[in-house]
Regions:
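Accessory terminal helices/loops
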Residues: 54-59, 67-248
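Metallo-beta-lactamase
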Residues: 2-100
Length: 248
């Protein structure tokens, strides 16, 4: 099946009624949106789950997590996960066909509460929002639909211009910290990155950036989101944008 990869394997042992879904079922939101991996296939993933649900397995041994027992329990787990994936993809494609940008879609798609409350659909590893991006990438390519980002200016130049227009780097840093303290983490991150790109070696920027991303990380339920944001925090402790960089 196509899912986490384009050659994902699952198996069924008819005599014992044992299903081995591999990583197509992991007792969590499916790992279909990993920000640091290649293309994943959300609708194909759902198709594979539905195919498995028709086998009437009595024991399921997932790639991660506990075994599941009982024909009806297994069927419900598989079909509800498929419904969850299909619903997200259907919403995304509908909005893409209306000419909406990726940013608009990220903030417009709604995740079904009744499905998110199921014990096997908790966003503890992947974040449902990341699935939106993966679907966009599959059908819409790398351009996010923002016309000014098709041929972007150098970010440091753009950031410096914004800081010049504001009139003070300190004002931006202070506002970013204020937003972080108000749990407006996304806006805080936007502002502090603008501050960073305008003055990458500024110690006050890195101090604020460390705090802002540490706070943002703590709010994440998914380990993917938490770890990436925490990486930014740790990098600023070293005066870097990213830990992979080398200091001059």
């Amino acid at each position: 099946a196509r899912g986490e990869t384009d050659d994902h394997l699952w198996a069924f042992i008819p005599k014992e009624k044992i299903l081995l879904p591999g990583d197509l079922f992991i007792w969590a939101v499916p790992n279909g949106g990993n920000p640091q991996k290649v293309q994943r296939y959300i609708s194909d993933w759902a198709d594979a789950l539905r195919e498995m649900s028709e086998l009437e397995a009595e024991i399921m041994l997932p790639g991660h997590g506990y075994p599941m027992f009982g024909k009806e329990n297994i069927k419900q787990a598989l079909t509800s996960t498929a419904e969850f994936l299909d619903d997200i993809e259907n919403q995304v494609i509908k909005l893409m066909n209306q000419g909406k940008t990726l940013n608009f879609i990220i903030h417009k798609v709604e995740f079904k509460k009744n499905l998110m409350e199921l014990p096997w659909l908790k966003p503890v590893y992947d974040d449902p929002e990341f699935l939106i991006r993966m679907i966009w990438r599959r059908y819409g390519g790398w351009w996010e639909g923002e016309y000014d980002r098709l041929f972007p200016a150098k970010r440091s130049v753009e950031a410096s211009l914004w800081i010049d227009l504001v009139g003070s780097l300190d004002v931006v840093i202070t506002k970013a910290i204020e937003l972080s303290n108000q749990n407006e983490h996304r806006l805080a991150a936007h502002l502090i990155e603008t501050a960073f790109y305008s003055d990458p070696s500024n110690s006050k920027v890195h101090e604020a950036r460390d705090t802002i991303y540490a706070n943002f990380s703590k709010e994440q339920t998914s380990s993917m989101g938490r770890n990436i944001l925490n990486h930014a925090s740790l990098a600023s402790k070293e005066g870097l944008r990213d830990l992979a960089e080398q200091k001059d």
